[in-house]
Design a protein with these regions (language model features):
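Two-component histidine phosphotransfer core
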Residues: 1-180
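Two-component histidine kinase transmitter core
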Residues: 198-203
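Short, charged, solvent-exposed linker or helix-capping segments at domain edges/interfaces
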Residues: 148, 204-207
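Hydrophobic core positions in the C-terminal catalytic ATP-binding module
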Residues: 190-197
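A short beta-strand-to-loop micro-motif at the C-terminal edge of the catalytic HATPase_c
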Residues: 179-190
Length: 207
């Protein structure tokens, strides 16, 4: 139990590092410069992202609604700052969103990867209920995960490693294990991330 708590503490620190990157001075400088010429709502998106980050990053599991809202804010900010932003489609099953809990940043991480590294023209975020579980998919038509990861622990690979570690540690406290898969074929375009989150068993506490 002591080892597991230490793992959870380290994962929280990794999430905080991700938040620092998300709200880095470089991003803030670019965002501020984007406000005047485009008359955009960049500042509003930045404030919302900061607010969600403060509320969420100290938690291991958050509501699906909050995770989706953070991801939408990130997409909106990215779109306001880039002219060549890919289309992002949200395919959300309303029955999957009531009272569901998901690992923190489990959608935002992969949306960010698709926007920043994949070079995709289309991204689909899908959430549905299947039996006694929530199924999440983030799919893009970009270069492909196996073709874009240049070195372990950097860029897209670092975010995926952190999420994989997070889910592995959280699974130690669950009777019904979460599943996390990256579907990518070397030399072929496109990546799909699939996360299956069974309904929580009684007595489980990963927060």
């Amino acid at each position: 139990e002591r080892h597991r708590q230490e793992e959870l503490r380290l994962i929280r620190e990794l999430r905080l590092q991700s938040a620092r990157k998300l709200l880095s001075p470089h991003l803030l400088f670019n965002a501020i410069n984007a406000v005047a010429p485009k008359d955009s709502t960049v500042s509003e998106h930045l404030v919302n992202i900061a607010r969600f980050s403060v509320q969420m990053l100290d938690k291991n599991m958050v509501s699906l609604g909050d995770e989706l809202q953070l991801s939408r804010e990130y997409v909106s900010l990215h779109r306001a700052m880039h002219d060549d932003d890919p289309e992002v489609e949200w395919d959300l099953d309303p029955s999957a969103q009531s009272a569901a809990s998901v690992p923190t940043l489990c959608i935002q991480t992969h949306v960010e990867n698709a926007l920043k590294y994949a070079g995709a023209s289309h991204i689909t975020v899908a959430v549905k209920r299947a039996s006694a579980a929530i199924e999440i998919s983030v799919k893009d038509d970009g270069a492909g995960y196996l073709n874009t990861v240049s070195a372990p622990g950097q860029g897209m690979g670092k975010g995926i490693q952190t999420m994989s570690r997070t889910i592995a540690v959280l699974n130690d406290g669950r009777m019904n294990k979460m599943k996390y898969d990256i579907l990518s074929v070397a030399g072929k375009p496109g990546t799909e991330v699939r996360i299956i989150i069974p309904d929580e068993d009684k007595g489980n506490n990963n927060r």
